Amino acid sequence: MTTPRSIRLFVIRHRSLLIFTVSIGLILMIAWPSSDSRHNSKQTKKKVLYNLMEETKGMPKHVKDCTIEYANAHKLQQDHPCLLDIIRRQHLNKPSPSDVPLFLDYPNVKDPSAGQVTAVLRLLRNLTNGFFIESGAADGESFSNTLFLEREMNWTGLLVEPEPKSFQNLAKRNRKSWTLQNCLSLEKYPTEVSFDKTEITGKIIGSKVSQSELDNGKLANVQCFPLYSILLAHGQNWVDFFSLDVEGHELQVLKTIPWHKVNITLIAVEWEHVEEGYYAIVDYMKEQGYVNFGRIATPYARDVVFIKDFLDDLRFDYVDYDE
């Protein structure tokens, strides 16, 4: 007859095996949850809408007049086929051929970043063949957070730069990544905004302005797209490193991202000009399942680095004691 004492002795002698078995079981349960558990999980979380097709049933997938004017006016969903087609056909510029050398002002400077690349290499274990997005790519060389990754680690990605002169210089670099002369939308739909060209980096200052206001040469109207729309147009939902520098609008951009649809491992966010402040970014990213790795503070950068907390869904308590 099995006694409580014999059961206790069995547990003690086979503790390691039992812990391993329980751990594997829990991991499998988490990795392949039942449809009921998925349904219950969605019910317990506060529902956030991201302007996606699945949220607006009845909205036609195909429109008669698929133009950027239509997309802006109707605030098309981030994943609407019309919007993705516009980005793909009219805004995504192909990488320079691999046999065309880079055209750099300072070719001997391997890493022009202000420390962001060091964080990427450390946290991603010198990952090769990765994929990045750099918003605020400037001229593609000066203080670039991705040039080293492209040159030395065989990465590729998306370089987003709305400021006309900076983009013109970027296009001359022969980078081996896709480029867009656009801004990331501050809304969950495409918008056209006015852009201040007088500052070195440039920044969004408001809505689209009239031609008379453009004639002074200080402003430009720029088309913005949600980050998720750009990724879908490129056929990408996995990003190893996202560098976000949009002169104060970083938190607004982050809030447009449907985090349940994309997988972004590492993010560097400039926080210096964000009106809501550093801790607002940290708190928001924590809610999205990211860990604050640390800050980069130099005369040229004020970034906070986040890494996805891949252990968050695997945590559990194991208690082993005699009652």
Cite the ranges covered by each PLM segment:
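Phosphate/nucleotide-binding beta-alpha loop and adjacent structural elements of enzyme active sites
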Residues: 2-323
